[in-house]
């Protein structure tokens, strides 16, 4: 059912545009009529039944007026809290510079925006509304490229926003879409608009995958929010991304916040920043995902050229055997598992519990600049120096041990609390095992 001229009786606001309602959305239908007060001079002409009915209607009207007054007081308190929350958000996003384009009509900028999106290889997407799923309602769709941000007003434009071009972008397999938790958006697009999202990079999935890499195959007890991912993977300060937590509060407390028109500029900037940060987050995750692969290739490259001619074998004879340089990945994973079991608690489902303290941003030395560090000097802390000395002593033993023996030997290694598994220390260990050469080390 499509209805026009919709008014929210709780807030008194007029909701713009045509509203689509499904059968399960309609709980009750009632005709509204005013209760007219009967003049006192006519009361003597009424029967007892009429008097009782009139009295009942009058009491009902008084109760309605009292309820209305209480509702207005509650609304005023809610508006005050909402205003204060918006001020906090404004303070947190004021320092950030981001430009955005609002698309709330089909002419003249809708067409150029669609063409720009179609020419991209990677875009990031966000969405807000009420209960984003097949039973919910979309209000805004956010799209970001490396140079532009578009905010599509789905509430005003309606389903035509998809038919006129966005559906082609969302279903295009040649365009990678970066989304944080794509489940809800995929559900509402599929069931309400018949759109199937294709070629998605989900940063929430990426975070779980990287945690599994860092812990040697373990899984975390839960997923991270976008705010937590930005802090952990991009080392962003919590104050820089606090607006994302306030966004969740607004959405939870004020279900209609994203249906206000015109939209508060602070909220528009919030939506723009949220989708803008997804692009660098994906890049950081990809670098971390390929770190093990990069280390293996580097060790492979140096396997023969740094050794003597005596170790060279016939290529035909060695093809079927797994080289020792690749077998070191198993050792590295075993070490990570041992380290993870000492750093994390394991719940009754066998999942590792990530603690709240993990939200603190990591230092640059713990892996955020690992690409440059792999090429330059490996710097070790005092705690890592002890670990380095242990590995220097035991590295020759690891090469010829079985998996069980390697695991037992790994238990002897001291745990380094601040050693980030994706950083330069993994690189040092791998280089130590994969060759007889000791890399240049600057111990600080």
From Swiss-Prot:
UniProt record, GO biological process: meiotic cell cycle; piRNA processing; regulatory ncRNA-mediated gene silencing
Localization, UniProt: Cytoplasm
Superkingdom: Eukaryota
Major subcellular location class: cytoplasm
Matches recorded under Gene3D superfamilies: Ribonuclease H-like superfamily/Ribonuclease H
The 3'-5' exonuclease domain, residue ranges: 142-205
Keyword terms of this UniProt record: Cytoplasm, Meiosis, RNA-binding, RNA-mediated gene silencing
Keyword Cytoplasm: yes
RNA-binding is among the record's keywords: yes
GO molecular function: protein homodimerization activity; RNA binding
Region Disordered, residue ranges: 49-76
GO CC annotations, alphabetized: P granule; PET complex
Domain notes: The 3'-5' exonuclease domain lacks the conserved Asp-Glu-Asp-Asp (DEDD) residues that coordinates divalent ions essential for exonuclease activity.
Known function: RNA-binding component of the PET complex, a multiprotein complex required for the processing of piRNAs during spermatogenesis. The piRNA metabolic process mediates the repression of transposable elements during meiosis by forming complexes composed of piRNAs and Piwi proteins and governs the methylation and subsequent repression of transposable elements, preventing their mobilization, which is essential for the germline integrity. The PET complex is required during the secondary piRNAs metabolic process for the piwil2 slicing-triggered loading of piwil4 piRNAs.
Subunit structure: Homodimer. Component of the PET complex.
Family named by the database record: Belongs to the EXD1 family.
The protein's name: piRNA biogenesis protein EXD1
Organism: Xenopus laevis (African clawed frog)
Source organism phylogeny: Eukaryota, Metazoa, Chordata, Craniata, Vertebrata
Gene transcribed to yield this protein: exd1
């Amino acid at each position: 059912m499509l209805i026009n001229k919709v008014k929210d009786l709780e807030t008194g606001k007029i909701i713009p545009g045509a509203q689509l309602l499904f059968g399960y959305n309609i709980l009750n239908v009632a005709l509204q009529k005013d209760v007219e007060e009967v003049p006192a001079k006519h009361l003597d002409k009424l029967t007892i039944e009429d008097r009782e009915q009139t009295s009942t209607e009058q009491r009902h009207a008084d109760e309605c007026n009292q309820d209305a007054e209480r509702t207005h007081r509650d609304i005023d308190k809610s508006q005050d809290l909402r205003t204060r929350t918006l001020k906090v958000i404004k303070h947190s996003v004021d320092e950030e510079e981001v430009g955005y384009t609002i698309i709330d009509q089909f002419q003249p900028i809708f067409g150029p925006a669609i063409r720009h999106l179609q020419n991209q290889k990677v875009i990031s997407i966000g969405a807000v509304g009420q209960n984003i799923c097949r039973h919910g309602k979309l209000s805004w769709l956010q799209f970001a490229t490396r140079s532009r941000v578009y905010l599509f007003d789905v509430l005003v434009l309606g389903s035509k926003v998809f038919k006129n071009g966005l559906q082609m972008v969302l279903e295009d397999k040649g365009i990678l879409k970066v989304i944080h938790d794509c489940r809800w958006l995929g559900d509402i697009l599929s069931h309400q608009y018949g759109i199937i999202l294709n070629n998605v990079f989900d940063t929430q999935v990426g975070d779980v995958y990287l945690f599994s890499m860092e812990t040697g195959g373990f899984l975390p007890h839960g997923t991270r929010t976008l705010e937590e991912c930005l802090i952990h993977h991009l080392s962003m300060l919590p104050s820089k991304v606090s607006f994302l937590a306030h966004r969740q509060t607004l959405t939870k407390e004020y279900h209609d916040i994203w249906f206000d028109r015109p939209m508060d500029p602070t909220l528009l900037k919030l939506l723009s920043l949220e989708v803008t940060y997804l692009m660098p987050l994906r890049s950081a995750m990809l670098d971390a995902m390929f770190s093990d692969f990069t280390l293996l290739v580097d060790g492979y490259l140096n396997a023969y050229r740094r050794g003597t001619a005596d170790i060279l074998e016939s290529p035909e004879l060695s093809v079927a055997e797994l080289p020792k340089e690749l077998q070191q990945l198993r050792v590295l994973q075993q070490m990570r598992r041992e380290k993870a079991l000492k750093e994390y608690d394991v719940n009754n489902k066998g999942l590792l519990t990530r603690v709240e303290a993990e939200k603190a941003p990591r230092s640059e030395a713990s892996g955020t600049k690992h690409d440059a560090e792999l090429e330059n000097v490996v710097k070790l802390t005092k705690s890592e120096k002890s670990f380095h000395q242990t590995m220097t002593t035991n590295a020759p033993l690891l090469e010829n041990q079985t998996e069980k023996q390697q695991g037992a030997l790994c238990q002897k290694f001291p745990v380094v609390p601040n050693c980030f598994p994706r950083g330069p220390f993994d690189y040092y260990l791998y280089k130590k095992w994969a060759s007889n050469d000791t890399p240049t080390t600057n111990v600080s």
